[in-house]
């Protein structure tokens, strides 16, 4: 195989890795919320969408640079998640069907609210010119922005791992996940843990939305498609941080390779078939999390 033959395939691999990185950020938010709170958050896609619209609004009104839009999106969407958790979700813990329906209702409210404020026309998030250039690495021509995405993802994964495995708060989260009653007997406030982790998961979805908004158009319905991929990453990964990292890389690269060989639509079909077969033989995912009493 010549360098000319290898180059498109190498570019496809890098493309898959960068897309998988954004899926991973969104999936980490889902993993945090489900693993700690036990809530299947149907509004997670709308948190992604809110992050994209936050970046768009800050750019169009204040002229805020893209890199500053990322932490701003995190804060704004985390606050929205905090309000939703305090105002609704906390009253529905240990009621899976009710939380499922409630978060689905929240997703519809958020979607229609954004449509009323911004309209249904597509919006775009701009990045600095330096991010729009390419660099030659071996056989591949890599987008600088995609390399920035990989760096941001690595930073978020490292920060999340440190928070949950090297801090007092992380110890409290893991204690609540294993046994809420036992954790309470040691003075751990489970409600506070739930509140913070829900907001944190929402904020991470906001960052993912800002990154997705650069690679695609920003629409009120954009979160629906992206949250499916995030759920797949969580399920295949087994609901753990390291499992999500492995699952995001695996699914992203597989879809990219399939799309390179066939097309995007058939690539998704093949990926979903493989996931169904995988879950048939390993229903708890790559790295299953130990379940305790909530």
Which positions does each model-derived feature cover?
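Alpha-helical transmembrane segments within multi-pass membrane transporters and channels
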Residues: 63-107, 113, 247-251, 282-283
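Membrane-interfacial amphipathic/re-entrant helices at transmembrane-helix boundaries
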Residues: 1-25, 54, 65-69, 95-100, ...
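Transmembrane alpha-helical segments in multi-pass inner-membrane proteins
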Residues: 63-75, 195-205, 209-275
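Transmembrane helix-bundle core of multi-pass membrane transporters
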Residues: 2, 91-166, 193-196, 262, ...
């Amino acid at each position: 195989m010549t360098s000319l033959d290898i180059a498109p395939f190498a570019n496809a691999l890098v493309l898959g890795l960068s897309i998988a990185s954004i899926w991973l950020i969104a999936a980490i938010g889902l993993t945090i919320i489900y693993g700690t709170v036990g809530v299947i958050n149907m509004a997670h896609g709308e948190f992604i969408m809110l992050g994209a619209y936050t970046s768009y609004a800050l750019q169009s009104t204040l002229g805020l640079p893209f890199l500053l839009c990322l932490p701003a999106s995190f804060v704004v969407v985390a606050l929205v998640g905090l309000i939703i958790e305090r105002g609704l979700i906390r009253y529905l813990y240990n009621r899976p069907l009710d939380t499922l329906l409630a978060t689905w209702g929240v997703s519809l409210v958020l979607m229609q609210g954004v449509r009323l404020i911004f309209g249904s026309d597509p919006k775009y998030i701009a990045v600095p010119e330096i991010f729009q250039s390419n660099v030659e690495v071996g056989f591949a021509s890599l987008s600088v922005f995609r390399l920035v995405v990989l760096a941001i993802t690595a930073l978020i994964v490292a920060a999340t791992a440190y928070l949950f495995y090297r801090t007092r708060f992380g110890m409290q989260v893991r204690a609540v996940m294993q046994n809420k009653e036992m954790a309470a007997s040691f003075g751990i406030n489970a409600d506070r843990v739930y509140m913070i982790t829900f907001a944190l998961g929402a904020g991470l979805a906001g960052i993912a939305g800002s990154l997705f908004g650069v690679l695609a158009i920003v629409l009120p319905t954009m979160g629906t498609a992206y949250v499916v991929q995030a759920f797949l990453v969580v399920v295949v990964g087994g609901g753990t941080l390291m499992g999500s990292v492995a699952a995001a890389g695996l699914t992203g690269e597989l879809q990219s390779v399939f799309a390179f060989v066939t097309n995007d639509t058939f690539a998704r079909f093949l990926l979903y078939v493989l996931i169904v077969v995988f879950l048939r033989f390993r229903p708890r995912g790559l790295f299953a999390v130990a379940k305790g009493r909530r």
